[in-house]
Amino acid sequence: MKICTVRIERRLLRYRSPIPTAHGPVGDRWTVLLALEDENGHTGLGEAAPLAGFTPDSVDDAEAALHRWASDDSSGGLPDGSPTARAAVDSALLDLAAQVAGTSVHRLLAPDSPDRLAVAALATGATPDDVAASAAEAAASGHVTIKIKVGVGEVDADRDRVAAVRERVGTDVRIRLDANGAWSASEAQRGLERLAVYDPEFVEEPVAGLEALAALRLTSPVSIAVDESAGSPKEVARAVSMGAADVVVLKPSALGGPSASAEVAARVRDAGLDVVVTSLLEGSVGIRAAAHLASAIGALDPLPGLATASLLDEDIAAPCRPIGGMLYLGTDGVGPATD
């Protein structure tokens, strides 16, 4: 396989409304689309989608790293200096290799992997009623796991949102929480004691930092998931060794791509922990790459957090939106089977 053409282009992601996080709202943002074309006309796609608070690089860093990689004929590897640029190249090369082989990326990596996967939805809204309505809509459309952002206000307000969602969706739907490291240790302990009655599946990043997570896990009534506090393979290994989490959230777009993420997942599972593959709120190119990874490594329960294309008004590719709570994977590279 010889790469004949490399195209690098900034694209704008537009969201239906800003997505609240403890790092601030995520609104319209730039991402970088990478296209690699071989001598037979196959085109592999990758996406570099840096996000402040979640990745160490900026969109300028990612774009510059991709241009350096493209101009270095002797490289043959992945870009330096930007994990999201590495993710874009790794994803594009896998897409291209699968097309050449006449199969999908997930079947290239694991021949017996499933071509569909249930995914968790993110409920959003400004008030408890708004969040509950969003969750109810997701549940009615077929989602059986729903994520709620907490830590964006007072603990009592978090409790009101979670209570409203649980009342609307009932007990058959799983709820997971994400605080993005916003709580102090005392706030997290108090908040989780109040929220445990609503039976959350786990809480992502209730406090920031691996030491704080490890300490909280000793007394938390809710399972702990590590996310942005372990944003690199080295940090994930440290989180596991410290006992900082029950669950490890893997964002392929932040970890350097599907290949690196698969290696990290294997080490996490060897230690007896669960992994959850999620998006970086990127466009559908990155989401599809993450979905194929989740299928290939069997990271199907807890459900992947990959329904986020539904939050976009303007995407960079054919939207990778769930149908009936499921993503359907294509048979040629990374898709686009699902609509």
Segments predicted by a language model, with ranges:
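Residues that form or immediately flank small-molecule/cofactor binding pockets and catalytic motifs
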Residues: R11-L13, T124, S229, A307-L311
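Active-site donor-binding loop signature of nucleotide-sugar glycosyltransferases
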Residues: A48, E205, L306
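Short helix/strand-capping turn motifs
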Residues: G298-T308
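A short pocket-lining beta-strand/turn micro-motif at the edge of beta-sheets
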Residues: H42, W69-G76, D246, L273-V277, ...
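Catalytic core of soluble alpha/beta enzymes
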Residues: I148, G153-R288, A294, L311-I323
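N-terminal capping/lid subdomain adjacent to the active-site entrance of alpha/beta enzymes
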Residues: M1-I175, N180-Q189, E193-A196, I316-D339
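Short loop/turn motifs at secondary-structure junctions
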Residues: K2, G142, D199-F202, G243-A244, ...
